[in-house]
Amino acid sequence: TGASSGIGRALAQKFSDEGWKVAISARRQNLLNEIAKEENIYAFPLDVTDENKVKEVFANILTVFKEVDLCVFCSGIYDPKLEQEINLNQIKKVIDINFFGVLNCIKSVEEYFKNKKNGHISIVSSVAAYRGLPNSSGYGPSKAALTNLTESLYFDFKKHNVRISLVSPGFIK
């Protein structure tokens, strides 16, 4: 998820370059279609906040790919201009996408990976999870919640031979 720009897009292109078949998803279909012109990349438009759509898209990916080995959940939003003041609606939107959206994605693949008894789920968080930053009243807490969630799920997934990992990059453009 989150493959229309930034880290998600770079990862999709890197995996494709290495010969992987890559399913990408994000809200911005025009950007997805541009990326999907590359070999081995298939676009699946998705709003991660829609739990039913997330399940539907994963089912569609399984139909096309037959098997999934790795899921990278990289969806997220951050706009420091919108977080200069505490705005509950903006904070709820950020947490809904950055935390609950990723949780929807994890939930949609959980049964598949546990039954397969193999696979890897990688969550992209942020250094903002570990330290408060200016203009980050929604973003930082959403990433901190992801970090804690991943650490908690590690124990449950490990029993099924499924790896779950967290990456916390610094600032990018």
Predicted regions and their residues:
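Active-site loop immediately N-terminal to the catalytic Tyr-X3-Lys motif
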Residues: 84, 133-137
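Conserved glycine-rich Rossmann-like NAD(P)H-binding loop of the short-chain dehydrogenase/reductase
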Residues: 18-35
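Substrate-binding pocket helix/loop in short-chain dehydrogenase/reductase
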Residues: 82-83, 87-95
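Conserved glycine-rich cofactor-binding loop
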Residues: 4-5
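Active-site helix of classical SDR
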Residues: 106, 142
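Alpha-helical segment proximal to the catalytic Tyr-Lys
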Residues: 111, 155-156
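Residue(s) in the substrate-gating loop at a strand-loop-helix junction
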Residues: 126
